[in-house]
């Protein structure tokens, strides 16, 4: 069986695609997988390290980019379709899976027009415009949140959860504070988040009284790396500051508390790992979908949400201290978080895809 996985750009789209690719190969090493992404995304760096093939197309987002850049992106759409047709014709897949991201639209539509089976994996509680359009044409749509059902025809929809790589389902740690340290994992998605980086630096002075009991692992992204690293060094904090964490599953397992954005894949990884989190939704996400994602965990008692506009170094430090002083609260949040995790999402999607192709 030959499968194209189209999309990416950020880890939120790419890593669910990798989870599906790994599940296909777990079933049969003879399955062939090809990713379609963009040159500007993180696909090339990540996929090459995992041994997956990648072809790129030239496509950019349209919404929220200003009149001139939106017009340029619109004019480039025909080229992205031509590139997609060429790649699909040469690879001759049995199935094309759209996982979101700019490359997903042209590749999935091209495959549909070529008579190839197509499916979507929608990670967010609120689907983006591209997936709402694609949903009219694809054969199946796999959802992570029940709130998303209303956007797609019910006969196409399956509630599977967001596919997550199996490493996130490792046995959870039973010790809240390994070696007496309370470990924070701070990240803003695969590319970092400037606002979270700055707020975390502002919190350091307020956290100094618990410096000897605290360890911080902070994924900054490449742009802020040196500035944030210097700030931690000046504070004397026990901190590991990295531009990108390749083995995020291990980082999750080592953490007592996560501080992060509320992208759909981060939400799925949090629940897969059964972790407590302070969620800071990206306020400029399309149609505020990160807030909607975060609210799912907040309602379940698995996370706290702090809007970015309400955040300060003092407030974040107070929240961290509060969780440190209430280990039983963290345990409760972890249990509720784990209760939301779906360990079988990738397997369920692959099962459905194989039935679809064989039909």
Regions found by a protein language model. Name each.
Residues 3-8, 30-76, 222-224, 309:
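Conserved nucleotide-sugar phosphate-binding/catalytic loop shared by glycosyltransferases and other
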Residues 41, 46, 50, 172-258, ...:
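Donor-nucleotide binding loops and adjacent catalytic segments primarily
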Residues 42, 53, 112-173:
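Active-site-proximal region of nucleotide-activated glycan assembly enzymes
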Residues 83-96, 103-119, 132-137:
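Glycosyltransferases and closely related glycan-assembly transferases
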Residues 93-95, 253-268, 275-276:
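Acidic donor-binding loop of glycosyltransferase active sites
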Residues 304-307, 311-328:
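C-terminal "capping" alpha-helix adjacent to the active site of nucleotide-linked donor transferases
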Residues 329-343:
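A short, well-ordered alpha-helix in the C-terminal region of glycosyltransferases
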Residues 342-359:
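C-terminal alpha-helical cap of glycosyltransferases
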């Amino acid at each position: 069986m030959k499968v194209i996985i189209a999309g990416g750009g950020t880890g939120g789209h790419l890593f669910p695609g990798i989870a599906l690719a790994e599940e296909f190969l777990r079933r049969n090493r003879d399955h062939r997988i090809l990713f379609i992404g963009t040159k500007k995304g993180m696909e090339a760096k990540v996929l090459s390290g995992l041994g997956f093939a990648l072809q790129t197309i030239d496509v950019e987002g349209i919404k929220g980019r200003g009149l001139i850049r939106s017009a340029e992106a619109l004019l480039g759409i025909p080229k992205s379709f031509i590139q997609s047709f060429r790649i699909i014709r040469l690879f001759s897949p049995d199935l094309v899976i759209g996982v979101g991201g700019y490359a997903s639209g042209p590749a999935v539509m091209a495959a549909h027009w070529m008579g190839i089976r197509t499916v979507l994996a929608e990670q967010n509680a609120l689907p983006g415009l591209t997936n709402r359009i694609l949903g009219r044409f694809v054969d199946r749509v796999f959802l992570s949140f029940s709130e998303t059902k209303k956007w797609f025809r019910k006969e196409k929809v399956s509630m599977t959860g967001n596919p997550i790589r199996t490493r996130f389902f490792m046995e959870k740690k039973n010790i809240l504070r390994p070696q007496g340290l309370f470990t924070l994992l701070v990240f803003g998605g695969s590319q970092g988040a400037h606002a979270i980086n700055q707020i975390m630096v502002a919190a350091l002075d307020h956290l100094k009284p618990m410096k000897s009991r605290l360890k911080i692992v902070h994924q900054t992204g490449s742009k802020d790396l040196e500035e944030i690293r210097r700030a931690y060094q000046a504070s004397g904090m026990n901190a590991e500051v990295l531009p990108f964490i390749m083995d995020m599953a291990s980082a999750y397992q080592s953490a007592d508390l996560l501080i992060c954005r509320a992208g759909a894949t981060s939400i799925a990884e949090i629940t897969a790992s059964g972790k407590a989190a302070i969620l800071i939704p990206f306020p400029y996400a399309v149609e505020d979908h990160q807030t909607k994602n975060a609210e799912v965990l907040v309602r379940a008692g698995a996370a706290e949400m702090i809007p970015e506009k309400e955040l300060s170094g003092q407030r974040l430090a107070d929240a961290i201290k509060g969780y440190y002083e209430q280990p039983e609260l963290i345990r409760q949040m972890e249990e509720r978080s784990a209760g939301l995790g779906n360990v079988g999402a990738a397997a369920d999607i692959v099962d459905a895809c194989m039935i679809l192709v064989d039909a």
